[in-house]
């Protein structure tokens, strides 16, 4: 090549490398940074960002690793260690994106109160508000009616004219007879009664006209018949009165004839009833005497059988009295019990007294 060689160029005309810049500032042989984002505590160190001011920063971790590998390879070739620049925005220059470092003293300690708290990685979201219960207004509100310009409001009459005819119509006036109560059942029954009366009246008129047509019956005939009926009724009433008077006379005569016979009949009935009572009393005495003698023999023969039969006889007398009387009579019941005990237990008392 015929061009000028690098060796022949003046030191001010050729470009200066990073190693030369670091060597001039006395950073050759400085220890390498362990982490990419950690700063050195040496105040004499000069970063590449301070030297170049036009190197963009890439936030991609993969790109950072590639850049770090290339930097180490370059250091191995030239024997210099370069301080890694801080991560900045890819669209901003490095000088503009330098983060302010905390002040460090000579011993490498950061004084308290001079370092601000690190900002969070992600921006904070706004706090959640409690949801209100109940109905809420929707985000999409209903369109308001067109009321025209605020400065020139539209009259209500014009708004009413825009409404539909159905909304603007008024109901029909109420008829005056609408409040009158209507009895459907009563009207139907009355209509049926009217029809029945009309039909009956029509039949009666037809019958009367037919009778007058064929028999010649007129109003004079009806009056004559009524007069004749009145005379006949008067005659029958007079005859009835006469008959009643005759019947009364006959009844009094018959009563005078039959009164002695009824007296004899009533006397005979009373005598018959008395004789029946006497006969029943005699039969009762005879029956009681026979039972007394029979129980006397039973008590002598077998007292157990006599005792059972005496109980049965007493119960029989009580039942018989209640059947004959057919009423709740405690006196008759007590008399029956006393008579039964006297007939059945009397022989036992006599035998014990004599023996």
Swiss-Prot record:
Topology versus the membrane, per the UniProt entry? Multi-pass membrane protein
Q: Could you tell me the superkingdom of the organism this chain comes from?
A: Bacteria
Q: Name one GO cellular component term.
A: plasma membrane
Localization in the cell: Cell membrane
Disulfide bond residue pairs = none
**Which keywords annotate this record?**
Cell membrane, Membrane, Transmembrane, Transmembrane helix
List all membrane-crossing ranges: 275-295, 301-321, 330-350
Q: Which family does it belong to?
A: To M.tuberculosis Rv0497.
Q: What is this protein called?
A: Uncharacterized protein ML2433
Give the species this sequence originates from: Mycobacterium leprae (strain TN)
């Amino acid at each position: 090549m015929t061009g000028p060689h690098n060796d022949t160029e003046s030191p001010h005309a050729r470009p200066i490398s990073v190693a030369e810049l670091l060597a001039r500032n006395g950073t050759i042989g400085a220890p390498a940074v362990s982490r990419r984002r950690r700063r050195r505590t040496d105040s004499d160190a000069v970063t590449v960002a301070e030297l170049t001011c036009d190197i963009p920063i890439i936030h991609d971790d993969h790109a950072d690793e590639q850049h770090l590998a290339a930097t180490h390879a370059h250091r191995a070739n030239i024997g210099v260690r370069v301080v890694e620049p801080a991560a900045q925005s890819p669209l901003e220059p490095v000088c503009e994106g330098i983060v302010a470092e905390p002040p460090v003293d000579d011993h490498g300690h950061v004084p308290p109160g001079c370092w601000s708290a690190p900002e969070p990685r992600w921006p904070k979201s706004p706090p959640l508000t409690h949801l209100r219960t109940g109905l809420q207004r929707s985000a999409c509100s209903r369109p308001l009616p067109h009321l025209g310009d605020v400065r020139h409001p539209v009259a209500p009459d014009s708004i009413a004219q825009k409404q539909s005819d159905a909304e603007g119509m008024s109901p029909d006036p109420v008829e005056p007879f609408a409040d009158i109560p209507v009895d459907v059942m009563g009207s139907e029954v009355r209509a049926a009664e009217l029809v029945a009366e009309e039909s009956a009246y029509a039949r009666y008129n037809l019958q009367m006209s037919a009778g007058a047509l064929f028999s010649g019956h007129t109003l004079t005939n009806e009056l004559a018949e009524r007069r004749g009926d009145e005379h006949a009724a008067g005659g029958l009433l007079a005859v009835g009165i006469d008959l009643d008077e005759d019947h009364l006379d006959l009844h009094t005569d018959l009563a005078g004839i039959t009164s002695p016979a009824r007296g004899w009949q009533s006397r005979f009935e009373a005598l018959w009833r008395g004789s029946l009572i006497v006969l029943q009393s005699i039969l009762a005495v005879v029956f009681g005497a026979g039972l007394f003698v029979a129980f006397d023999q039973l008590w002598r023969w077998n007292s157990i059988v006599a005792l059972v039969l005496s109980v049965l006889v007493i119960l029989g007398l009580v039942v018989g009295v209640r059947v004959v009387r057919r009423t709740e009579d405690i006196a008759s019941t007590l008399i029956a019990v006393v008579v039964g005990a006297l007939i059945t237990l009397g022989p036992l008392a006599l035998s014990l007294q004599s023996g």
